[in-house]
């Protein structure tokens, strides 16, 4: 809100948070939500939401000459670094999460040829059908809002079948607490 009060021309790539009431309030304060960098006018101020954006989108925003306020969650930024490094090393990035989630789409945009699996069953199926080749080096990350249970189920499969896999626990503890508290209510 402070930024909206100080800036005239403020945009966000996608909704900042998953809360329609808050998004509507921010829009009433002057925030314009856009779907892509091509909708950002030169000289605007742009907020990158906590889910992050792909490398291509980030660079496209920078090319507009916009002032960029990067609110990407530090945990998500770390995943971007992990998968980018994996690609640079020739490792196959595997992302455990919801393929259509903005965070996962953004992660995919920081690496080459990522494979996204939703859960242990899909992971096992992708290994069985050869989409994931366990003989090759893999780097496995998980969407920050996923559960430890899902990670452990996938970890069992990976440890049993893949000999050269680096598995990163990239789940956000704060998200787990929030999810747990919401489930308790």
Language-model-detected regions and their locations in the chain:
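Internal gly/pro-rich beta-alpha loop/helix module
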Residues: 68-69, 82-88, 93-130
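Short acidic low-complexity segments
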Residues: 32-41
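N-terminal beta-loop-helix "entrance" segment that forms/cooperates
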Residues: 14-30
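Short, glycine/polar-rich helix-capping loops at beta-to-alpha or helix-loop-helix junctions
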Residues: 19, 53-58, 100-105
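Conserved small/polar residues in nucleotide/adenosyl-binding loops
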Residues: 178-185
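Short internal beta-strands
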Residues: 10-16, 95-97
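Glycine-rich phosphate/diphosphate-binding loop of Rossmann-like nucleotide-binding domains
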Residues: 144-158, 162
